[in-house]
Amino acid sequence: MQKKLDSLLKAAGITLPDRQKQQLLGYVGMLDKWNKAYNLTSVRDPQQMLVRHILDSIVVNPHLQGKRFIDVGTGPGLPGIPLAIVRPDSHFTLLDSLGKRVRFLRQVQHELGLTNVEPVQSRVEEFPAEPPFDGVISRAFASLQDMLSWCHHLPAKGQGRFYALKGVRPDEELTQLPPGIELESVVRLQVPELEGERHLVILKAN
């Protein structure tokens, strides 16, 4: 697993300290173990988890701005846990409505010694953003419209951003953005060994 992670990181042009690599591998180990009982992800193979969960999350890191982030519909902690590992100076609130997922996240937090994450069990519309966040991240929403509708109260006005992880570039959705939302950029993400396209849509909340 260590060799596989090293080769993926090298292919992606990402350099990480050993401690962060060990934390990422520890997270995959826990995800694999808990998945057998809790069905946290449809990805069963730990090697594939490295590609589809770890690399697919941390390639977002260079594009994030700010220190306080919320991962909405985080599931088993994606992309929030891998991002928290590689951004130890930032804080990540991990929001999910299912108790079993939040229990898993708390165990990950404890075992990996992550002091910069806060797992929260809540529906997004009931979660108060006090203070508002620098960034709202998600790969859980089917559409940008859904994300903006459910999460409109979370980012800091004028400087907060939405970071939506998508497959193909959602050009049609981008023509239907509501007032007060500005398209900042669409980034084509390069994820080694991942089939299909990946894009990061960055929207600013004005």
Curated annotation (Swiss-Prot):
A GO molecular-function annotation: rRNA (guanine-N7-)-methyltransferase activity
Family, as annotated: Belongs to the methyltransferase superfamily. RNA methyltransferase RsmG family.
Protein name: Ribosomal RNA small subunit methyltransferase G
Subcellular location per the Swiss-Prot or TrEMBL entry: Cytoplasm
Function: Specifically methylates the N7 position of guanine in position 527 of 16S rRNA.
Taxonomy of the source species: Bacteria, Pseudomonadati, Pseudomonadota, Gammaproteobacteria, Enterobacterales
EC class name: transferase
HAMAP family registered for this protein in UniProt: 16SrRNA_methyltr_G
Gene coding for it: rsmG
Binding-site positions, S-adenosyl-L-methionine: 73, 78, 124-125, 139
Primary location class: cytoplasm
EC number: 2.1.1.170
Cellular component, GO annotation: cytosol
Catalytic activity, reaction form: guanosine(527) in 16S rRNA + S-adenosyl-L-methionine = N(7)-methylguanosine(527) in 16S rRNA + S-adenosyl-L-homocysteine
Coiled-coil intervals: none
Keywords (A to Z) from UniProt: Cytoplasm, Methyltransferase, rRNA processing, S-adenosyl-L-methionine, Transferase
Xref: InterPro entries: rRNA_ssu_MeTfrase_G, SAM-dependent_MTases_sf
Pfam families: GidB
Key word Secreted present: no
This protein's record includes keyword Phosphoprotein: no
Domain of life (superkingdom): Bacteria
